[in-house]
Amino acid sequence: MTTQSQFLVNLSYGGLASQSNLRANNRVSPSSCQITRTNRSWALPVSFKVEKFQLQRGRRRRGSPCFGESEGLVKNGIGDADGIIIVDHGSRRRESNLMLEEFVKMFKEKTGYPIVEPAHMELAEPSIKDAFSLCVQQGAKRVVVSPFFLFPGRHWHTDIPSLTADAAKEFSGISYLITAPLGPHNLLLDVVNDRIQHCLSHVEGDADECLVCAGTNKCKLYNSS
């Protein structure tokens, strides 16, 4: 019988509301991890419990809509008329922007989704408007904007929705959705641990630099003075 355990996720964001007003300004639903805006300030909960489920008969049980382990395993109709935009912040460094293009290429090959475009929120092209237009040109009737951000902040609450709405004004009959950022997803635990282990192996001389660090000479041990 599948057992259920819980772990505590601590989140804080001081740029939009003080912690003293946190619980007064927002209502947190433990089952959906959604935050309801009740005044003009956005805030995140100081802490909340997230359910975690183990495997049962070879597949994962459906977990929380925001943080469940089963995210991405239940298909919900991504088809030929859907376009996906993966948007990051954008950088003045060309190398950083090229990494998003490489990630989008990997994502498209892995998922088989026909319409996937990269976009940068600012500082670089293609913009969200550019990517939205490319999706529509390829036949998309619904555009899914996926922020390549770890946690929700001003860019997710305000900037990306505003830029996407402006892009959508150019077209009629096109719907769009802005998904949640990555958040404390269970799969990210493995990603972070893998990165740590690889970099430790590199500084010990047992592994080459990863693609992110390659040529930067950043992945090395520093000694405090």
From Swiss-Prot:
A GO CC term assigned to this protein in UniProt: chloroplast
Ligand binding (Fe cation): 89, 155
Reactions catalysed: siroheme + 2 H(+) = sirohydrochlorin + Fe(2+)
Record's keyword annotation contains Amino-acid biosynthesis: no
Cofactor binding annotation: Binds 2 [4Fe-4S] clusters per dimer. The [4Fe-4S] cluster quickly oxidizes to a [2Fe-2S] form in the presence of oxygen.
Listed result of changing residue 199 to A: Impairs [4Fe-4S] cluster binding. No effect on enzymatic activity
GO molecular function terms noted in the UniProt entry: 4 iron, 4 sulfur cluster binding; identical protein binding; iron-sulfur cluster binding; metal ion binding; sirohydrochlorin ferrochelatase activity
E.C. no: 4.99.1.4
Residues annotated as transit peptide in the record: 1-46
Membrane-crossing residue ranges in chain numbering: none
Residues noted as binding [4Fe-4S] cluster 2 in the record, renumbered to the chain: 213, 219
Outcome when changing residue 213 to A: Impairs [4Fe-4S] cluster binding. No effect on enzymatic activity
Pfam families in the record: CbiX (PF01903)
Signal peptide: none
Family: Belongs to the CbiX family. SirB subfamily.
Family matches, as PANTHER family: SIROHYDROCHLORIN FERROCHELATASE, CHLOROPLASTIC
Protein name from the UniProt record: Sirohydrochlorin ferrochelatase, chloroplastic
Organism whose genome encodes this protein: Arabidopsis thaliana (Mouse-ear cress)
Taxonomic lineage from the root: Eukaryota, Viridiplantae, Streptophyta, Embryophyta, Tracheophyta
